[in-house]
């Protein structure tokens, strides 16, 4: 099973707002939804999916295990709790949201617990998020690269994360990009704007098309129907070599997500 290239993010969306966003997205044809224990919206996402009437087997649902639930005695019970909230017997993908701060729980312990969850049928695939190269090495040592479906990382035109991407690719680990639009900063970029005009597209479509063209999955979020519909069209936009080179030149290692006490030592 391959991870869909395009999905719906739900970070920072809660209650009625996330219910409306998910229901609208599913109506428009989205089939992948990304949530997490710490987003505090799994129950709302579950409600939206249930009310949408879309058959479960058409959906690809991702959740993420929070750092408090990484130990082997907590991980599986916490995932079962997530499943209850999401109103499903299984998720398609479960990620370790952040590596354990200060290595409080070893990579080996939580990866093996996550693999056990997969063996129990609670999740179809497992993966990681915010993992550096040394952490990916440990994760592979714990469960084998074949079991690591993706590394979900911050990745935008301003933070192209080439080192991590190239290493992951060489080891068969797919990349999912979050914060692809750099909190909207990249939408104001002149280079992006020029490419958008050239293709009669929006800056958002250009950035999402660029990321998908690089082989990454994207999970943009929106609360507005027109934006959800417009974002979806990024799948039909194909950039040429000139466009790709222009965006490659925007990389300036501008990282926006690095919570103190949580972030690892970045590559």
From Swiss-Prot:
Subcellular location(s): the record lists: Cytoplasm
From the UniProt record, which GO molecular function terms apply? aldo-keto reductase (NADPH) activity; methylglyoxal reductase (NADPH) (acetol producing) activity
**Annotated GO biological process:** L-ascorbic acid biosynthetic process; methylglyoxal catabolic process
The answer to keyword NADP applying to this record is yes
Q: Where is it mainly found?
A: cytoplasm
What reaction gets catalysed by this protein? hydroxyacetone + NADP(+) = methylglyoxal + NADPH + H(+)
Q: Where does NADP(+) bind?
A: 179-231
> Which SUPFAM superfamilies does UniProt cross-reference here?
NAD(P)-linked oxidoreductase
Which cellular components does GO assign to this protein? Answer: cytoplasm
Annotated binding of substrate, by residue: 97
Recorded E.C. number(s)? 1.1.1.-
> InterPro entries, alphabetically?
AKR, Aldo/ket_reductase_CS, NADP_OxRdtase_dom, NADP_OxRdtase_dom_sf
Q: Is the Nuclease keyword given for this protein? A: no
Q: Which residues form the active site?
A: 39
Sorted keywords for this record are: Cytoplasm, NADP, Oxidoreductase
Going by the record, the broad EC class of this enzyme is: oxidoreductase
Which domain of life does the protein's organism represent? Bacteria
Q: Family per UniProt? A: Belongs to the aldo/keto reductase family.
State the protein's purpose: Aldo-keto reductase that significantly contributes to cellular methylglyoxal detoxification by catalyzing the NADPH-dependent conversion of methylglyoxal to acetol.
Indicate the quaternary assembly: Monomer.
What is this protein's name?
Answer: Methylglyoxal reductase DkgB
């Amino acid at each position: 099973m391959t991870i869909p290239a395009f999905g719906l993010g739900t970070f920072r969306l809660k209650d009625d707002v996330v219910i409306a966003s998910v229901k609208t997205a599913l109506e428009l044809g989205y089939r992948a939804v990304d949530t997490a224990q710490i987003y505090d919206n799994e129950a709302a996402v579950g409600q939206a999916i249930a009310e949408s009437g879309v058959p479960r087997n058409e959906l690809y649902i991702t959740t993420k295990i929070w750092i408090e639930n990484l130990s082997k005695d907590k991980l599986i019970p916490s995932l079962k709790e997530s499943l209850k909230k999401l109103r499903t017997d299984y998720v398609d993908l479960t990620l370790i949201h952040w590596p354990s701060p200060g290595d409080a729980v070893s990579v080996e312990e939580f990866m093996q617990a996550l693999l056990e969850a997969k063996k129990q049928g609670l999740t179809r695939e497992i993966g990681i998020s915010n993992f550096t190269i040394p952490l990916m090495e440990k994760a592979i040592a714990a469960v084998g690269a074949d079991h690591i479906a993706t590394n979900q990382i911050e990745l935008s035109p301003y933070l192209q994360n080439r080192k991590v991407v190239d290493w992951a690719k060489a080891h068969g680990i797919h990349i999912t990009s979050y914060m692809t639009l750099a909190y909207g900063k990249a939408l104001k970029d002149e280079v992006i704007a020029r490419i958008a005009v050239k293709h009669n597209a929006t800056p958002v479509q250009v950035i999402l098309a660029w990321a998908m063209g690089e082989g990454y999955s994207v999970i943009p979020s929106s609360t507005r129907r027109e934006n959800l519909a417009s974002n979806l069209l990024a799948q039909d936009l194909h950039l040429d070599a000139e466009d790709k080179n222009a965006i490659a030149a925007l990389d300036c290692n501008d990282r926006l997500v690095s919570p103190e006490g949580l972030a690892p030592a970045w590559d």
